[in-house]
Amino acid sequence: MRAYERLLKYAKVYTTSDPESGTHPSAAREFDLAHLLVEEMKSIGIEDAFVDEHCYVYGSIPATKGCEKKPALGLIAHMDTAPDAPGENVKPILHENYDGGDVTLPGTGTVMKTSTFPFLKELKGETLITTDGTTLLGADDKSGVAEILTAAETLIKKKLPHGKLCIAFTPDEEIGEGASLFDIPGFGADFAYTVDGGDVGGIEYENFNAASATVTIHGFSVHPGSAKDAMINASNVAMEFHMALPVMARPETTEGYQGFYHLCQMYGDVTEAKLGYILRDHDAGKLQFKKDNLLHIACYLNGKYGPGTVEVEIKDSYRNMLEKIKPHFHLVETARKAIEKAGLTPEEIPVRGGTDGAVLSWKGLPCPNLGTGGFNFHGVCECTTAERMDKATEILLNIIELYSK
């Protein structure tokens, strides 16, 4: 079975994670795919496959004769899809021998224009996989799941030499909790890769340092007819707070290594207002500056409107994995060789986000990220191609081969 055929099956299983539930997994529906995967893993020869009570799927393939002393390699992908777009009743569509032009998604009439998505022209002649426009596809990261299992099946069927291969599929990555209950000792790998990136050939070993901030503004309500010099409108103070942040440090104005402040939520009235931010930067020092800046703005506004008017609560989320990858840079070097062996040029770009691998790296399991061949994640224009998924699978097999020597 080719990887894309697995994706078509997995995409139809509803696994959107729920950021509000507070449970692990965040949604019981994630077990539906987990149980399907365990059954499939056992059917291809991964005899110890199981899913635990928190919806983490684990399994391993023992080393072949002569490779018992080779390092144990881990491959990890996540099963959940992002809550940013609908993930139920996904209807994948195959566009065979895609012509490289605009694509109309029939469920909504949404047009994927090459002027908006220039990469589409590079997919000409491939089998493009999209949705009907009513949902996301779930290539993030069911493509990674499919590619790992296709590589595992090939390994077993062809009896290729390899060290121990450890496989895991996680829940709740999209809400930042994919690695929270991951059993690293039980997983058994010396190091690993997440297969959760964008276009095939990508290697990611730098990610954002991340924090979140909740800004609460306490106002003072007075009848507007007699409010002069008395009312403090919390919503107005909230706008003043936000406008004190640099306009050129927002997601829509930054790229590459440039960090940002992202206003995710805002609501309020005269009496109280709240602002929810995420803060991101590859440089830990620059992230600290952003956190300090929020506190300085609050201090200024409290001086203007009175003590306690503005409160800021900041929480750290995850850290840049680079520091933990550097001592194990063979992971990057091996991935480069594997990608080149597949006839591609490695592309190494900083992740403008986070991965399970970033958290796992800081927990002691070095874990860079590899491309899956997908594009436009978290939206109805999400897509991939059968050929790029084949190539991603080939790269995984090349990595396994290189670590068996």
Please provide the spans of the model-predicted regions.
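Metal-dependent amide/peptide-bond hydrolase catalytic core
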Residues: 235-405
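Midchain, well-structured core segments that form catalytic/ion-binding scaffolds
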Residues: 117-120, 126-139, 172-299, 308-310, ...
